[in-house]
Amino acid sequence: MKLIISSLSALLFSGVILSAQMPGMVTMQQASASQGTSLGANTTSGAAGIALGNRVVMRGFVDFQFKYDDEDSNLTPGSGSQTEAFNTKADIDFLFDFSPITGEVHIALGKDDIELEQAFARYSLNRDFNFSFGRQLTALGYESDEQPGLQSVSNAYWLADRLAGNAQIGTAPKGPTQTRRNYKDGVRANFNNGKFGVSFGLHDGYWKNDNFNGDNIAIDIAASLMIVPGLEARLGYAQEQYDDQSGSSDNISQLNGWIAYQPGDLTLAFEFDNMDILSDEYWSMMFHANYQFVNWMSATFRYSHEDYEAMSVSNEADRLSFALLFSLTENFGLNFEYSTTSVDRLNVGDYDEFYVEGLLTF
């Protein structure tokens, strides 16, 4: 409770002392209330970026981060570990508009590998209805999958992805379970008329697997309503049946809902998640607040709670984050974040993180 009060006080105090505009600073356009939902929409046509001819647009970002973390152990009081690291990654997207056919290719570049994030095409039957097929971003979840859309440096949730990889039935699944938004192959039917959007997808895996072997198949459906300009509510459900090599079968399912309000400079959001991960159970909630004090500076306060029950053992995490985001030019931002996570597990205690990020967008 003291931590929550002190964090709220810090947010208010920072807003007071930093709300005066810095002279000579290059400014950006302030946020305005969103007029429509993006779920199911054709967001390729008319997208901003660097024009490479009449029908191709390129956009992307370079993300450079310094991270310091301090992890305490619950096993031995006073013990733990501290690490510091630099990390650089980049992302390049190519958008093609041959209306009524549009398409996108997203490439992620890290220091060790190059990954195809998304590669899909879309056929628009009319202004409101379209089909998309290929490797696409999954629909469930409030947080952006890429740094420029986060309004922070880190993600809200700490516990789920670290434990979900241990969920197993019969033969242990290979690799971790990505419980947040990721990229999967499949087909989607989409509808969007501005005020209301819906998307229904069929995939060869949503969290695990990448084939239709056995009964491995996944579906997801999400619907979004722009109640009034700036106030959006979204609800989605996804399920994947998982069959391992031993013949055992179980499901992974997720119910996700969020509501966001953005009247102008203020953004408020609340998200709730409930998942059955094979034989494990997981639920989480997140509150997100961002305020644009001036054109070149905003602040974000975020709180999340997670409860992960594996083999009747409950693991909980409470995470508080505070970020200051500075737009030095239209294309370059300098961001700072402090996050502290209280973890109720046998071998992990408090976990503190500090980030400095330079973010170039184009």
Predicted features by range, described:
Residues 64-70, 89-91, 98-100, 107-111, ...:
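Transmembrane beta-strands of outer-membrane beta-barrel pores
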Residues 75-80, 148-154, 317-319, 353-354:
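Flexible, surface-exposed loop regions and adjacent strand-edge segments
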Residues 326, 332, 350-362:
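Outer-membrane beta-barrel "beta-signal"
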Residues 52, 84, 107-116, 179-184, ...:
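Solvent-exposed loop/turn segments connecting transmembrane beta-strands
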Residues 5-8, 13-63, 362:
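N-terminal periplasmic/intermembrane-space "pro-region" immediately following the signal or transit peptide
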Residues 41-51, 96-100, 125-129, 193-195, ...:
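Outer-membrane beta-barrel proteins
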Residues 44-69, 80-205, 215-217, 224-232, ...:
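Outer membrane beta-barrel
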Residues 195, 224-311, 318:
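Detector for outer-membrane/organellar transmembrane beta-barrel domains
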